[in-house]
Amino acid sequence: MSVLVPMVVEQTSRGERAYDIYSRLLKDRVIFLVGQVEDHMANLAIAQMLFLESENPNKDINLYINSPGGAVTSAMAIYDTMQFVKPDVRTLCIGQAASAGALLLAGGAKGKRHCLPHSSVMIHQVLGGYQGQGTDIQIHAKQTQRVSDQLNQILAKHTGKDIERVEKDTNRDYFLTPEEAVEYGLIDSIFTERP
């Protein structure tokens, strides 16, 4: 099923110019991460962040997140780019930021991580399902544990929680209201109106 993307028409000195809504918002330094985090989405988000950095390395990038999570490698590529680019990346949860989405939400610039009032945040451990020979399963289990440890370290760094607390909380699905996400350190504030 194809999705129609709304168009926006702007008046310029040279006439009218039509943009799809996401391209128009990109001009205002807004990037949307919506749906499953996967390689294609990650490549688009990374390209947009790099483009915005080249346009103005001193102006914040706004990352709007509404995601149930997805592939850890894709999320880590986005996260690493968020940390790499010179502009601060402001994050805003609109709807949900679960799993990989919560990691990206927390990975925004300190003091610039936000939720809307009826959003939901969820953290948990890395999920994996493997089959095959026993030795292959052991290899994948070690890798899953290594990545899980890495993600817990990142969450501990951005929340200020000790690693033992993060490991305990991510052992199962851990849902947080925006107020709880502020208290936990995943975000800094809740937007009830435009700042």
From Swiss-Prot:
One of its GO terms (molecular function) is ATPase binding. Keywords: Cytoplasm, Hydrolase, Protease, Serine protease. One of its GO terms (biological process) is protein quality control for misfolded or incompletely synthesized proteins. The active site is at residues 99, 124. It catalyses: Hydrolysis of proteins to small peptides in the presence of ATP and magnesium. alpha-casein is the usual test substrate. In the absence of ATP, only oligopeptides shorter than five residues are hydrolyzed (such as succinyl-Leu-Tyr-|-NHMec, and Leu-Tyr-Leu-|-Tyr-Trp, in which cleavage of the -Tyr-|-Leu- and -Tyr-|-Trp bonds also occurs). CDD domains: S14_ClpP_2. The keyword Cytoplasm applies. It holds the Pfam family CLP_protease. Cleaves peptides in various proteins in a process that requires ATP hydrolysis. Has a chymotrypsin-like activity. Plays a major role in the degradation of misfolded proteins. Fourteen ClpP subunits assemble into 2 heptameric rings which stack back to back to give a disk-like structure with a central cavity, resembling the structure of eukaryotic proteasomes. Its EC number is 3.4.21.92. The keyword Cytoplasm applies. It comes from Coxiella burnetii (strain Dugway 5J108-111). Signal peptide: none annotated. It comes from the Bacteria. One of its GO terms (cellular component) is endopeptidase Clp complex. This is ATP-dependent Clp protease proteolytic subunit. Belongs to the peptidase S14 family. It is found in: Cytoplasm. PANTHER family: ATP-DEPENDENT CLP PROTEASE PROTEOLYTIC SUBUNIT.
